[in-house]
């Protein structure tokens, strides 16, 4: 919520119709917006000398009737310090002092009510196996319980009357008129709610409560400036409206929903936090930036304590539905803030003060400030961990990008981190916290003791269903201080079906101990209680329940505690059952020296020849000699050739599966796989060459000379790569020192090491038991017997723990001197591996190396805890000049772009795969680079810049991500750098893979979602086709190629094209061909053609050009366009694809309506395609209903 209003309105009413109390002489007083269904004083007092903020929130929530699943939406606000308190903040109050705080909803999600169809629906995750309700309002109501809903309404009223939307911020007469009308409507809803709540006529309420008490303060002051006659006329008009209004069936709840929905529209700042920061920097480890290291001195990237007193340089916006965004504050705004005495803490408050003064001086509203152009950083699900050092905050993203912030004070930094952490727990993982400094005490206890949050019964049932004897302990959904032990029992129904019956046993807290109902023993912790119950039988009447294994919370699991935003996404898991990798021709590789042996492979250094563009200087460094003669015909890359021994042809499939896995992932700390080459009987995996080779070899060579700080940076990078794989539910399976390749040494001052995790080699399932034993201690114990069930991300956590020991011990892994039988015996007896001398590091490794897979921490947890493992003498190792200018991560330099291969061509441009390697040492990331063809004219170059300007403003899951630009001033060229999507376009992918109808319909739905977003930004694509839809994985597509995209002018319905050039006419609607007009509906026509392509699996013999040319006959140039236009106007359309269901072809034909206004919008198409997708999901092709 915006913070500025508390400073302005400390004497105002925290509850709409209750007076604010004076502070007590001693103790803590927490003011409320709503005192609960029974009423009472709008505050709660505490006399305890020491409490945590979480304890206070839980006590108040219980008092007013808020249920445990909604606890995490609330927090305490300190109006005097203008900060929110993190949940672990300890409130120590002397008896002779007093403290006043506010209990408020802090975590807010716009459109939770579902009243705005233009915004994503928000709802709690539904039970497993169910789909979300189509009623968005019903979805939203699941977010809040009745008490939270009442509290939000009262808090919203308080925000509104205290100018969360101010009249003085508006500039045009139209805006001011709209604001006044909406405010009077809000006042009416306010009075209507009072009438319905008290059961009295609306006119009676209006006599007791003036409408001026229900409108913003700025509006009230504006009314006071009018004459008495004008004020009387306004009052009479409002009363007449109240008298004539017939409420009908308008319920109290609907009034409240309408009030809050209108408040969202009128006040975009409602439910958001805009945090001023004194310093902001974006970092990318790929550029050689050092990691953020915890130490006793100033952090390397810490701008220093003096910056905390300066004015804000940036603002960070945090919203529940929009994630984290930022923008630079203009110097003029900073000067105004400094002169207003706000000390940079609250720029909006000072800005408001200046406007008020200006208004009093001239009697007119001041010009509204320019709305900031927010730069998107990430969603909460993309965050791996957050580091807090004094007043400096570092937010780390899944792709290794980092946002560094310096806030005005330590309290402001804690407030900000607790905000990000709270949203993360609400949207990504309810059983994980991002930063130790703001960790909720109850969650810390729950993680330590294996306690689930307040789960609803369907989620409990789903967790206990897999096997008999499972049980779990979770917090009650109705009582904040009660735990529930739930156990399941299968029973045989008369019809032969098995049913799962749950039995719940309450666990009460008594004097700091935990007692299971019906059992006289007490335990100091839930963990000890659970350990005592392991293997026991619980009797309840005639029933007997066996407790065999406790079901522990797992990373990122879905439950009613997770809030979904937008359409329910399909799991982003890669399809590993289908092989997908680049085929390398044997003529493109040259085998050089032998490097050693791997598991059933021989490893060679090699050269991979990649096709060049004919430019002899392309890809050449300034100080680099040509690799080979004839560089103008291409270039050669240094690679590693892993040759599978021909005698092991029986495991070639497992070898291919490894190549396929590594070809479908892209991360800066994963070694790149170029593809597979079949050379006679040999199968060769062609992988990236990394300069300094295996880490374990290098560590042993440098024994005793590698500082611990260096090793911890390497450990963080390895954990980052494994966290990326875990997030995709992928298993590496062979994490060890020899598979970590050292790309940069990072021993020089101001540099850091850089590693890449290599491919795992031959899959674990193809190895013999002897080969698996050889991999001890890196192989997880559960994997030793073999079998598909043993493969899980938990095995990578064990491998990481063993590798961490290997790194700490300078490349010497434990148990290497033992015989195979001794290694097996070690695992069978569940012995512990040796631990490092550092206690914190020993704790982390022991957690990774526990024999129970479900108890191993997630890689998010590992990354978070690694930041606390740094020794106190690291400041001198990674010192960075804070005054050095920050590099712009969106600016790419040509000399660092190394071409790998061409990816495809469009009408005017060419897309290639490059490795961006600014340090020239193998640490680059794979990017897709688009450049104009050399023969393009000025018009095309102008359109090219427009394409870049469009793409850099877009951010959507189903639109290709913009990374930056590469500009060459000498050649006057501009290249667009985008994310690399490994699987390529649908046009190339579908003919080579067997994709079912349901999956094709999912792709179509995602295309509609991306196009709906594009249209909402007032752009038309003009080139939507299967060739321009890219496949990230087998469940996710992204729209690319915006070369023909145009911005629709404000107030217009179409864009008229005037330039000549090649156009994809067979995808164009009649109005485009005939009148050169492109409506939003013209993209819908193109979508219909794209859907046709999908249903034909992009068969070239069934392509739109082929089919249309069959209908119109032989023609050239404009005659083709003319005949095509006549054909379409006669009602001729593309035929129904083979095995295309009737309703899908009917949908295509709706998109092909001749009249643009008759075509559906993409917003209309999304729910239709979702329904059709759900219908055919899981059905065999034979049951599809075709015409």
UniProtKB/Swiss-Prot annotation:
Residues 335-366, 610-629 are annotated as: Disordered. GO terms for molecular function: ATP binding; growth hormone receptor binding; non-membrane spanning protein tyrosine kinase activity; protein tyrosine kinase activity. Changing residue 1023 to N: Complete loss of catalytic activity. InterPro entries: Band_41_domain (IPR019749), FERM_2 (IPR035963), FERM_domain (IPR000299), FERM_F1 (IPR041155), FERM_F2 (IPR041046), JAK (IPR051286), JAK1-3/TYK2_PHL_dom (IPR041381), Kinase-like_dom_sf (IPR011009). Residues 450-529 form the SH2 domain. Its EC number is 2.7.10.2. The modification Phosphotyrosine is found at residues 292, 604, 1054-1055. Changing residue 1055 to F: Reduces basal catalytic activity and abolishes IFN-dependent activation. It is linked to Immunodeficiency 35: A primary immunodeficiency characterized by recurrent skin abscesses, pneumonia, and highly elevated serum IgE. This is Non-receptor tyrosine-protein kinase TYK2. The lineage of its organism: Eukaryota, Metazoa, Chordata, Craniata, Vertebrata.
